Amino acid sequence: DPMRYTQLLPGIQTCSEYDSGIHIQGCDNSHNFVGIEGVPVYNASHLLGLFSTFNASHFQSMDISKNPFKASHPNRIGGILEMRLHDNIHTNVNGGLEIGPLSSQGTLHSPLGKNSSITLSARSAYLNLLYGSMLKIDGSSLKYGFSDYNFTFQSRFKKNTRLILNAYYGNDNSSMEEEHNSDGIRLKWGNALVSATLRHDFSNVSSISHSIYYTGYRNRLQWKVTDISMSLPSRIQSVGYKSGWKQRFLNIGIEGALHFIEPQTPNTSTDNTATDVTFRAQEHTF
């Protein structure tokens, strides 16, 4: 697990073994930037922190920066953890499959013609299937499952020009329900990410790139007691564009992002009434 590996490095700590968040140089986990090729991933964890969001077999490497004080770094006061995709165009079909006691994952690399390739990966947990009969609390049935999917397409138009399309989707579902009635609590959360990057290499030390992206995180808590139901959904969505030029040690770039934030939307209902209270916010960053 990439997030678990970082916790073994100097200057990086975690609160407990059941926390996939990292605390770099004493900063809170929420102060770090976690992303894929410069695109942020919010709340990057599964199973309340036991698993991280990233399927390691889908990526080529991981970059870690403990001191993000460069102008090109994201606007965070903590560190940076960034997953990097494969640079090369795959020329043959290969992949891997891993089966564990809690989850399994698989990855497939395949060429699409001479100048294009695709990478697919998926991961899923099967706690309910194997351990469902043991997951009970005071007569209530406890259920949990997660899955995530990665997609990457690369194509070389010319010798030094490449198009990279990347997508990620992850989903978690947990619930605790009474066995003899419909009372219970449900919690769902997940991420979605899509990005497109066009990069041209002038030489080994000079390149220019343009990227557009969308990333979002959603969370929804629901509970029901007799004839009363309540839910607390929240979400954050970001749309951005970034462009950069690199020449040896010189980097010049521009980035803009639009954030849509919905902290909470309380909703209560009974058999006869329903109430909605909505809070929304927008933020622009450049």
Regions found by a protein language model. Name each.
Residues D1, D19, G49, F59, ...:
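Transmembrane beta-barrel architecture of outer-membrane proteins
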Residues D1-F69, I80, H86:
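Periplasmic N-terminal accessory/gating domains of Gram-negative outer-membrane beta-barrel systems
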Residues N29, V39-V41, H86, L102, ...:
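Structural signature of outer-membrane beta-barrel domains
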Residues H31, S57, H90-N92, G113-S117, ...:
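Strand-connecting loop/turn motifs
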Residues F33, S61-S72, G78-H86, V93-S140, ...:
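Predominantly transmembrane beta-strands of Gram-negative outer membrane beta-barrel pores used
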Residues H90-G95, L102, L130-T152, N181-N191, ...:
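Outer-membrane beta-barrel proteins
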Residues F151-D172, K188-F286:
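Face-selective signature of the C-terminal outer-membrane beta-barrel domain
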